Amino acid sequence: MASLSQITLPRAPSSEIGLLRRRLERPIIRTRIGFNGRIASVLTNAGDQAVSVKASVSQKVIEEEAKVIVGTYARAPVVLSSGKGCKLFDPEGKEYLDCASGIAVNALGHGDPDWLRAVTEQAGVLAHVSNVYYTIPQIELAKRLVASSFADRVFFCNSGTEANEAAIKFSRKFQRFTHPEDKEVATGFIAFTNSFHGRTLGALALTSKEQYRTPFEPIMPGVTFLEYGNIQAATDLIRSGKIAAVFVEPIQGEGGIYSATKEFLQSLRSACDAAGSLLVFDEVQCGLGRTGLMWAYEAFGVTPDIMTVAKPLAGGLPIGAVLVTEKVAETINYGDHGSTFAGSPLVCSAAIAVMDKVSKPSFLSSVSNKGRYFRDLLVKKLGGNSHVKEVRGEGLIIGVELDVPASSLVDACRDSGLLILTAGKGNVVRIVPPLVISEEEIERAVEIMSQNLTALD
């Protein structure tokens, strides 16, 4: 059999392969154990001897992955080889409607021409030099982030978890800088139930799921988890004077698409101001146009001292950013933090292309309108099912809460050509499509979900 490097992957569905697929009647399920002991099913077609090399590319990729990749992911049995707009294709030409967007990353979908032009042009000029030197795209991107938000300054990194690690360090440095005479300064943190802030040790300590934290203990001490939305408990603990910063997601993504209330965030702001604690908003998933506003915090009338962003910022390339006020920035000195790859000309050029599109009022308005249409259609088509408890969200970050595990519906939809995710305790369907999704694609997504509701029985 040809090696993977010798196989040409198609960029569009093939009628010949489609005909072959229809002729194959009996699926064979192979299984492999993923992380956390989860079993990931691998679907291969009967009649392997009759399947061409091209038609067996996915199977070969899955088999070879198991030999060379550390088993941290329980992957869906799908190999994706190309994409355009909100559509993805496997090597055999099967089409998928992408309502996962790389876990809320591909804001402009796949192959956006302006994004592609920015990346290819910059790659031909200068890709990386490190932060030993100044580069123009980094400064231009920082100016855009500052102009669009509460922030005065920006620190660049490479991911959401890195951004939260930096926010942890900045918070503790702020307390030591502003209380130079104190022998014991505030070093504690508050995080909330259902929170997700990352998987590196500091960010992991702020993440509420015990199954993520337990295998790696001891992790960073000093974190107290409170009920998301509990104003009294948060206010009392902040008043203790031991809290360096409060980390909160205005809308929880991984946690189940739960939105904070305006009263809750305003109370955190007031308590932090009174105690000298910092308020950190994690908008890694809900920020940058996802809610129909440039930043999710705008809906609450509350501004943080620090905000972490990442996922969609560079349209699929790795980036993170920490946005801070001047009072925080002035406490950070040379050498307090850094990153070799952060803010590279290549990635920043990609991010500029994303921001220049997403920040337009007409674009944000379209996200808000499409999100409302999506939710209304979900309520109409799915709301009558006994397993569907609630449809919630803002803009194009949407959750469908069920009274049973969501994985069976997610799997059935995937087999029918729709990619969606789970969230919460596994009972929430998470829908985070590219922000450029069309109404016709929304209708198609809801129709596929509706047709597969029987998988929940």
Curated annotation (Swiss-Prot):
<dbReference type="GO" id="GO:0005739">
    <property type="term" value="C:mitochondrion"/>
</dbReference>
<dbReference type="InterPro" id="IPR049704">
    <property type="entry name" value="Aminotrans_3_PPA_site"/>
</dbReference>
<keyword id="KW-0028">Amino-acid biosynthesis</keyword>
<feature type="modified residue" description="N-acetylvaline; in Acetylornithine aminotransferase, chloroplastic">
    <location>
        <position position="42"/>
    </location>
</feature>
<comment type="similarity">
    <text>Belongs to the class-III pyridoxal-phosphate-dependent aminotransferase family.</text>
</comment>
<keyword id="KW-0055">Arginine biosynthesis</keyword>
<dbReference type="GO" id="GO:0009507">
    <property type="term" value="C:chloroplast"/>
</dbReference>
<protein>
    <recommendedName>
        <fullName>Acetylornithine aminotransferase, chloroplastic/mitochondrial</fullName>
        <ecNumber>2.6.1.11</ecNumber>
    </recommendedName>
</protein>
<keyword id="KW-0032">Aminotransferase</keyword>
<dbReference type="GO" id="GO:0042742">
    <property type="term" value="P:defense response to bacterium"/>
</dbReference>
<dbReference type="GO" id="GO:0003992">
    <property type="term" value="F:N2-acetyl-L-ornithine:2-oxoglutarate 5-aminotransferase activity"/>
</dbReference>
<comment type="pathway">
    <text>Amino-acid biosynthesis; L-arginine biosynthesis; N(2)-acetyl-L-ornithine from L-glutamate: step 4/4.</text>
</comment>
<keyword id="KW-0150">Chloroplast</keyword>
<dbReference type="GO" id="GO:0080022">
    <property type="term" value="P:primary root development"/>
</dbReference>
<dbReference type="GO" id="GO:0005507">
    <property type="term" value="F:copper ion binding"/>
</dbReference>
<keyword id="KW-0934">Plastid</keyword>
<keyword id="KW-0808">Transferase</keyword>
<keyword id="KW-0809">Transit peptide</keyword>
<keyword id="KW-0663">Pyridoxal phosphate</keyword>
<keyword id="KW-0496">Mitochondrion</keyword>
<dbReference type="GO" id="GO:0009570">
    <property type="term" value="C:chloroplast stroma"/>
</dbReference>
<feature type="modified residue" description="N6-(pyridoxal phosphate)lysine">
    <location>
        <position position="311"/>
    </location>
</feature>
<dbReference type="GO" id="GO:0030170">
    <property type="term" value="F:pyridoxal phosphate binding"/>
</dbReference>
<dbReference type="GO" id="GO:0006526">
    <property type="term" value="P:L-arginine biosynthetic process"/>
</dbReference>
<dbReference type="InterPro" id="IPR015421">
    <property type="entry name" value="PyrdxlP-dep_Trfase_major"/>
</dbReference>
<keyword id="KW-0611">Plant defense</keyword>
<dbReference type="InterPro" id="IPR050103">
    <property type="entry name" value="Class-III_PLP-dep_AT"/>
</dbReference>
<feature type="transit peptide" description="Chloroplast and mitochondrion">
    <location>
        <begin position="1"/>
        <end position="41"/>
    </location>
</feature>
<comment type="function">
    <text>Involved in the biosynthesis of citrulline. Essential gene that modulates defense response to pathogenic bacteria, conferring susceptibility and repressing salicylic acid (SA) accumulation.</text>
</comment>
<dbReference type="InterPro" id="IPR005814">
    <property type="entry name" value="Aminotrans_3"/>
</dbReference>
<dbReference type="InterPro" id="IPR004636">
    <property type="entry name" value="AcOrn/SuccOrn_fam"/>
</dbReference>
<comment type="subunit">
    <text>Interacts with the P.syringae pv. maculicola effector HopW1-1 (via C-terminus).</text>
</comment>
<dbReference type="InterPro" id="IPR015424">
    <property type="entry name" value="PyrdxlP-dep_Trfase"/>
</dbReference>
<keyword id="KW-0007">Acetylation</keyword>
<dbReference type="Pfam" id="PF00202">
    <property type="entry name" value="Aminotran_3"/>
</dbReference>
<dbReference type="GO" id="GO:0048364">
    <property type="term" value="P:root development"/>
</dbReference>
<dbReference type="InterPro" id="IPR015422">
    <property type="entry name" value="PyrdxlP-dep_Trfase_small"/>
</dbReference>
